[in-house]
């Protein structure tokens, strides 16, 4: 049995929706897996300490910024910084396969900017991106990436 860990934060419900649908899709398509959702907001809200991951994971990060346009006059990450703190804890950054960014394309250059910044900060790739709650095609695309990373076997 392989454990797939999805580390994320959801503030408006969009990322929660995507990660939940992704979990359901993975469980329906691949055998001998369990999918663990780790919602950083819940850890913070419940006052739980961050911990070191003992196996690889994929991070999911929405974009919440204030100030600037994200390109030539700056930006400030807001609300999602606990994810960065979790990734920075112990050796967690080295266990992260990469980040999946989300956002709203209406914000142009700021779309998925936080995921791109985490990629640079921690040295792992941006694996994919999706807008708002994501579509079924986004779920399938991210699931295929996860299947490759974890070397999963199809359910057929």
Curated annotation (Swiss-Prot):
Domain of life of the native organism: Bacteria
Organism in which the protein naturally occurs: Streptococcus pneumoniae (strain ATCC BAA-255 / R6)
Gene Ontology MF annotations: FMN binding
GO terms of biological process kind: protein modification process
Family matches, as InterPro entries: Flavoprotein-like_sf, RNR_NrdI
Name the UniProt record assigns to this protein: Putative NrdI-like protein
Pfam families in the cross-refs: Flavodoxin_NdrI
Stored SUPFAM superfamilies: Flavoproteins
């Amino acid at each position: 049995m392989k454990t797939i860990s999805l580390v994320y934060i959801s503030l408006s419900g969009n990322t929660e929706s995507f990660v939940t649908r992704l979990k359901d899709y993975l469980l329906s398509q691949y055998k001998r897996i369990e999918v663990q959702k780790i919602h950083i907001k819940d850890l913070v809200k419940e006052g739980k300490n961050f911990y070191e991951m003992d196996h690889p994971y994929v991070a999911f990060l929405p974009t919440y910024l204030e100030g600037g346009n994200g390109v030539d006059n700056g930006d400030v990450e807001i609300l999602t910084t606990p994810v960065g703190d979790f990734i920075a804890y112990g050796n967690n950054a080295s266990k992260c396969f990469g980040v999946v960014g989300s956002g709203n394309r209406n914000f142009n250059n700021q779309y998925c900017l936080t995921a791109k910044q985490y990629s640079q900060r921690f040295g792992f790739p941006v694996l994919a991106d999706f807008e708002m709650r994501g579509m079924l095609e986004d779920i399938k695309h991210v699931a295929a990436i996860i299947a490759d990373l974890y070397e999963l076997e199809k359910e057929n």
